[in-house]
């Protein structure tokens, strides 16, 4: 892999990669943040006994929809950029086969545009103006990932003969009766025109994975002995680690070039606005630098139940609650106490809300009851304590589960056993 990634020619490859499972101990440090996530269908047999028991008790059922999973198993027909491939090979993964190679001309055609948007966002005086420039930049990236194969033709039909002709067509999908004399007929387009630069969008997505992986494997793991991943998203990541004061300050100084310290207090020793609103740098999740050990505000409490469902609380009692799929009107009812009950008592939080829906272009008001918070997570192999997890599809997952001793609980009691003892 001596081909340079800085030339005018770029490469996207479809490869088969082996995670070198014969030396699983070497990749134990990868388990918290595995390389090369992929979309796969998770079967019930892939889940841990703890998750399966929780499914039976709550009556929950799995869906056959593919989920984005980060695991240590081998990858087949995986598509990635050459720079990303070089990175994973440098960290011990093995290249088994190259299935296809796409060569293209690469230039920084959006560099000036992005730099101008970043400058305008930095100069913004209001939050709405700042968010506006962010949306302008994100919308450009979203158009690059537009899938032309998902387009649908919709025709408004009033005649019976015309409607019958469209329904009998091979391209017919479905129809909606709006009134006795008006029907909407949906059909597949007869031809697909690929007019969006999907290669640019795919390259940006692949390089964003590379930025996250580089930060964890090249910076965090080299500065801290055992960093534990708390949560991660497309543009955010949070690790938990315990270090001595001297080691913490040394690591903080060595990693200062990847952070944006503009949200810290002006009197803080690390405060700087040189990287304010610049892409590619990490900033504090909480105001005034929660990542700084001696700052006035830092993260003091964290609860996480499943993907994109977590709660942060700081020393100054400020909270950040993330709850994907939960309506905003019900999100205010979630807090540290509800997350604590869901994790330690396996309780299910439900809520009722009203919404306006349209059926056949007629507005109705519905009263819905939704499950807001639960411990069910189908993206990780949850161990018997219910508080620790490992990646899915591991050959030694059952052995790890049997020998596991939870560091957050006394002895080998699970969270559910502790709750039963309290009730007794």
Residue ranges and their predicted role:
Residues 1-424:
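Conserved acidic
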